[in-house]
Amino acid sequence: MARALLPLLLLSLGCLYGGLAQAGEPAPLVPPDYWQNGDWQGMPDSTQVDKQRVLFARHDGDSYLGLAILLPDWQRSGQLWQLTRDLGRLGFDTLLLLPSPQQTELDPAAEKKQQAIDDFRKQFATRISKLGDAKLQEGGFRLLLAQGTSAAWAANLIASEQLPAPDALVLLDGFFPNQQSNQTLAKQVAQASVPTLDLYQEEGSTWPLLAAEARKSESRRSHKLNYRPYALMDLDETPGRIQGWLTHLGWI
């Protein structure tokens, strides 16, 4: 009986693979951020702006201060979104742009990947500008709060004028996984005119700590105005540090 079934089984497999071969096209690859978009699709604050999945929350009360654009590191969206309630109390609408896996894979110093880097920079800058413009109300401040590699790329884009400078910039554990790129980033941050709050976790990972130290040293050397570095004992300190800094800037 088994011998009789074997030819039928082989014939069936041959038809299956023959059909696939005739199709001549492989199954389309799932985009790297496909599952991320699916994870956030059902959230109450999830919406679409310009056909892109974002998280958006309006400010509390009648006092509107501006728009806080949140740029989380890869797989850190939930962590950064926790700041929404505190920012809303200050009068900020909050807009979170879901990160791209490319931001952790690409390095500005990698000459062999320059085309991919240029394409990513252009796409990232366009997303930030376009989605931010769609949600910013007239007369409000634009606050850019970026984390990890998103922070490094955002500061890099602002310095190269590919991204219009916000009214203020908050970096949270900003870094590239390359010392040369971090040194270049430190000079760019020091030379930029945008007011910058540079937050980093005191017990954080090696790359963010090295990158933060480079920015502090370069900003002191350049006598950068409106630059404030601060070591966080805990991420829960972040809202209070942002509020104190905005008070210093005269926003609240």
Q: For each predicted feature, which ranges?
A:
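Bacterial N-terminal signal peptides that target proteins for export
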Residues: 1-9
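Primarily recognizes the serine-hydrolase "nucleophile elbow" in alpha/beta-hydrolase
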Residues: 133-191
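The feature captures the conserved acid-bearing segment of alpha/beta-hydrolase catalytic domains
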Residues: 168-234
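Serine-hydrolase catalytic machinery in alpha/beta-hydrolase-like enzymes
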Residues: 53-55, 60-135
